[in-house]
Amino acid sequence: IRYEPIGVCGLITPWNFPLNQIVLKVIPALAAGCTMILKPSEIAPISGVLFAEMIDEAGFPPGVFNLVNGNGEVVGNHISGHPDIDMVSFTGSTRAGKLIQKNAAETIKKVTLELGGKGGNIVFADSYPNAVRDGVRHIMSNSGQSCDAPTRMLVERPIYERAVKEAVDEANKIKVDVASKKGDHIGPLVSKIQYDKVINLINAGIKEGATLAAGGPELPDELNKGYFVKPTIFTDVNNNM
């Protein structure tokens, strides 16, 4: 058995954990002896630039690691369809992943995709006592922008009322403030597009008849601008919403 480098790898990373995702893709490729082209998210590019500077300072030969900034429609499509790139690794939305897979098929390159998706957080009556509170904190960490955030909580009926009270109490404890301040709080969403998407979903939940138990579409107290969203919880939700 021989292990050989794949060759040139196109690495496309998301905005929600920029440096983490860069490291997870670049280091294994380097260790395997591959060369690579990294395209970080266009709305979170600074981590990629800093990482490129570290690679340069570490003394890697020119051409082993290459950084290209730009949007997905232009740079991402070029990477996924380029005949001289042997593999593309993408983390991001399912919509973009479909486009990358179709584009890569033209050159029969290897593709790895880690795509968005939300699974329900299931809490049974005999679950450990802090399951609901821990679940809410998990959802709200990173300002709710984690790809594995369990944004739906499915609770067994005998503990439903208690679970609602605990979830609302925990959400109301979470402070929202500017990221530059020290302290135990969450910051704003990453962009206007993401902010508008979340606010539209909150308004849709209200319009479709779910009970707004915490939070809402208004800016948090003492914040009069920015992409800040209150930790929001709906109850009485059904699968048709």
Annotated model-derived regions:
Residues 1-130:
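Rossmann-like NAD(P) dinucleotide-binding subdomain of oxidoreductase/dehydrogenase enzymes
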Residues 87, 95-239:
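ALDH superfamily catalytic-core signature
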